[in-house]
Amino acid sequence: GKRSPSGKLPVSFPKSVGQLPLFYSDRTSGRPGNDRYVSMDGQPLFPFGYGLSYTTFAFGKIHINKNSLSAGEKVTLHIPIKNIGDRDGVEVVQIYIQRQADKEGPVKTLRAFKRVEIPKGKTQEVKIELPYVAFEWFDPTTNTMRPIQGEYNILYGNSSRMKDLQSAKIQIQ
C-alpha cells in the first residue's frame, strides 16, 4: 500500500442489462416483454473515466486565457487540483467539450486528459492547451467534422459523470 492506484476505466459499466444496446439478430420468443429499460435512470454503474484511489482530490475553479477562439488559435486552461487526502496520489484530469446548440450529436466528447502526481496536502495547477480543432463537431450541411460557430462548454473533472464535472463557457468563432 505505499502507492495509490490511479487507473481509469476506458469504458462505462452498465448497472443492468437493460442499459445495453438492443440487437435484433435473434427472433423474438413471443413471450410478454418484461424489461425495465424504459424505467431506468440511464446512469451507468461505473462511468467512462472512473477510477479508485486511496486519496481524494478537489478540483478548483478553472482559469481560461480567452473567452473566444478563432481559427488557428488555441486556448490554455489552468486548473488547480488539491490532494485533500492522507497520501500522495495520481489524478487524471479529463477535459470534455459540449456543444450547447447540438441536440443530435454526443452529449460531450473527451478532447484532452493529463495525468498528474500530487503530494498529500499540496495543490498543483494543471495546464492543458486545446487547439481550435479540438472544437470540431459534425456538420450535417457539409458532412464533415469542423469547428462550428457558437457557445461550447468546457467540462473538466475526474470522470465522465456529470456530477464529477465542473464547467466553463467559450465562444467559437
Q: What is the meaning of each model-derived region?
A:
Residues 86-103, 108-110:
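Short acidic, flexible loop segments centered on an aromatic residue
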Residues 1-90, 96, 149, 153-157, ...:
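Secreted, periplasmic, or luminal enzymes acting at the cell surface/secretory milieu
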Residues 74-76, 123-127, 165-167:
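Intrinsic-disorder/low-complexity, polar/charged segments enriched in Ser/Thr/Lys/Arg/Asp/Glu/Gln
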Residues 58, 63, 80, 112-119, ...:
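Generic structural detector for well-ordered beta-strands
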Residues 131-173:
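Terminal connector regions
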Residues 102-140:
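Intrinsically disordered, low-complexity Pro/Gly/Ser/Thr-rich segments with frequent PxxP/GP/PP motifs
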